[in-house]
Amino acid sequence: GFQADSYIRKKNYCLWGNALYRNGRVKNLKWNETSDWELLYPYLLADSVGGDLSKEIYSFTGGYAARYESITWGGNFSYEASVAYRGIDPRPKNTTSDLSLSLGLSIPVSSSYLFDISVSGRKYKQTNGIKFYSELGVSKVYHLTGLGMHYNRFAGNNYCGGSLGVHTSRSGGFVGNVAYRYFSCEKIISSLNELPMARIGRHTFAGELLYRKSLSGIESWGIKLTGNYELKLGTENIFGDAANQIYPKIGEAEQYSSHAYRLSLSGFYEAVRRKGWNYSVQPRVNYGRVKAEYVYPLREMSVREVTPEVALSVSRMSKDWFLRLEIGGNYAMTFDSRLFHTPSSIDDAALLSAWCYNYKNLSSDYVGYYAVFTCSRQVGKKYLLQLDLKGGQYRYNTDIVATDVCAGLSFLF
C-alpha cells in the first residue's frame, strides 16, 4: 500500500491531511462474505466454501484547527471506499463507502483546566452481492437469520455521537472524558423488491480518567482507567404471503441482543537519560465480558476474559538519527464461559458446527507478543527517511497461531 500525510502549522491555525491506498488479500476466509463484519454483525452473508478474498481500500482525510484568544476549535473529515472480490466461486463483490465528520471545541474553565466538547456523524453504505458461474452447481448461501442466495444491500445513515471531556493545560494533572455513539443499519434484499429484512442498532458508551505527574522534568508517571460498554440490538421483520412479488410487513421481533463490557487499568513510567536515551514501561490489565442472546429458538453465548499485559520501549535521538525499539506481550485468561442452544427443526448442522467452533476459539486462553522497530535518518535539512518494522504472534490453546508481519518505508518532507 501507499500512504501520504501532510501537516501545516501556522501561528494561530493548523491543517492536516492524509491519503491512503491499500491492496491486500485475506487467505482462506470462510463463513463470511461481508465486508466490515464487526460493524454489521449478526446480519452477514455467509457460505461454507469461502476462499481467498482480495480487497482494495481508498481513504482520504482532512482537518483544520484554529485558536481564537483562549478558545480552540477544529474539525475533521474522512472518506473511505473499498471493494472486495473473489475470482472463483462463490464470487462475492462488496463495495463500501464510509463518510465521517467530527467537530470539537475546547474552552478554558480555570487557569489549569480546559473543557472539551465534540460531536460527530457518519454515513455508511455497503452493497454486498454474490454470484456463481460454475456448471457443477452452487454452494448454499446463508443469511445468519435465514438462508438463500440474494443480492443484498446494507445502508446505514443514522450514526451520531459526541463526547465531553476535561484536560489540563499543564504537563501534569487529571484528564477525563465521556462519549456516546449510536449506529443503526438496515439489511435490504434487493431481489425481493427492496425487502427490509432486518435492522441493527448499536449503542456505545465510553469513559476515561487519567492522572499524569512529572518529576524534575526528566521523569514522569501516570495511571489511567478506561471503560467501554456496547449494546447491540437486532430486529427482524415478519412478512405475510407475497402478492405480485411484494411481501407485506405484518410485524417485527427483537431477536438478537449482545452486551459487551470492557474495563482497563494501565500505568506508565518514562525517563529521559543522558545522550538522548529514553526509557518507558507500560503495564496494563484488562477485563472483558461478552454476552449474546438469540430469543427464538433460544441461543446464548457468554465469555469472560482477564488479560494482563506489559510493554517496554527504549529510544535514542541524536543529531541525524532516531532509533526506537518496543517489545510487549500479554496473556488472556478466559473463565465462566457458556454456550447454550435449544434444538430446533430449523437448525443447520454446518452452521451450528461453525458457531460452536467460533465459541471454542473465543473461550480459549491465548498468549501474544510483538516487537516494533523504528529507524529515522535526516537527509539534508528538510527531509527524513524512516523505516518501520513490526512483527507479532498470537498462540491459542486451540492450536491456532496468528502471525502478523509488517514493514514500511516513509519519506518525510
PLM regions and their residue ranges:
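Residues that define the transmembrane beta-barrel architecture of outer-membrane proteins
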Residues: 1-2, 54-60, 93-101, 156-162, ...
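Residues on the lipid-exposed face of transmembrane beta-strands in outer-membrane beta-barrel proteins
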Residues: 2-8, 60-66, 101-107, 162-170, ...
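Transmembrane beta-strands of outer-membrane beta-barrel proteins
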Residues: 13-19, 71-77, 113-119, 172-178, ...
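Transmembrane beta-strands of outer-membrane beta-barrel pores
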Residues: 21-25, 66-70, 79-83, 121-125, ...
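Outer-membrane beta-barrel translocator domains and adjoining extracellular loop/strand segments
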Residues: 28-34, 85-93, 128-135, 186-195, ...
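Short, flexible helix-coil linker/hinge segments at the edges of structured domains or between repeats
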Residues: 31-44, 118-158, 182-199, 239-246
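Outer-membrane beta-barrel "beta-signal"
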Residues: 111, 401-413
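Long, internal scaffold/assembly segments composed of regular secondary structure
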Residues: 149-285
